[in-house]
Amino acid sequence: MLNDKTAIVTGASRGIGRSIALDLAKSGANVVVNYSGNEAKANEVVDEIKSMGRKAIAVKADVSNPEDVQNMIKETLSVFSTIDILVNNAGITRDNLIMRMKEDEWDDVININLKGVFNCTKAVTRQMMKQRSGRIINVSSIVGVSGNPGQANYVAAKAGVIGLTKSSAKELASRNITVNAIAPGFISTDMTDKLAKDVQDEMLKQIPLARFGEPSDVSSVVTFLASEGARYMTGQTLHIDGGMVM
């Protein structure tokens, strides 16, 4: 389905990003596994992709740093020569109530979760416009639609991603580049596993399908959006939340 397409997945060393990278590879894509800290985990993902008979490289880059992002794009093109798919997945949390939130907690989340999406989108557009094709998939969150107490920075960033997705889609459509977002709900990862059991139980009550999502529930939708099956979709945000927000 994605044979010999080149995909960049940011924050791909673990969790949802790892699942996305592996799912794209299973569909035939070669993958750039971006990471910012855990090189060993990123290399494990690369090895798994290579075991499928696909090509992969791990590239360290802080997505909030435009120079890092440009270097990642240069390395990608030197190895693969095209960039067909960008998945903006990298993200962090620094939760706190508004009245207690420190400026660096706000800035860190906005810089990674929103500015990082802008930096990577900007960096790939020239190549995708030259190719007259491309797929950009941005990972937002259901809380970017609904809001969530104690996460003003994260919610603002993820809501911003939805707006950026729409503007990017309108700007790039004439060059056959689609831009869509996904809004996952409560997905079981090492990040969410740290939440207290009572918090998890309360979340579960809000989900009509009565279970937490798995990373594969998210990655399968990303793979669809990267495929020809989604060629007439752009500017959309797909909820992957078990019906939590309707």
Swiss-Prot record:
Determine if Plastid is one of this entry's keywords: no
Query: What highest taxon heads this organism's lineage?
Result: Bacteria
**Which pathway is recorded for this entry?**
Lipid metabolism; fatty acid biosynthesis
Q: What class of enzyme is it?
A: oxidoreductase
Molecular function GO labels: 3-oxoacyl-[acyl-carrier-protein] reductase (NADPH) activity; NAD binding; oxidoreductase activity, acting on the CH-OH group of donors, NAD or NADP as acceptor
For this protein, the Enzyme Commission number is 1.1.1.100
Query: Which chemical reaction does it catalyze?
Result: a (3R)-hydroxyacyl-[ACP] + NADP(+) = a 3-oxoacyl-[ACP] + NADPH + H(+)
* Quaternary context: Homotetramer.
Protein name, as recorded: 3-oxoacyl-[acyl-carrier-protein] reductase FabG
Q: From which source organism is this entry?
A: Bacillus subtilis (strain 168)
Taxonomic lineage is: Bacteria, Bacillati, Bacillota, Bacilli, Bacillales
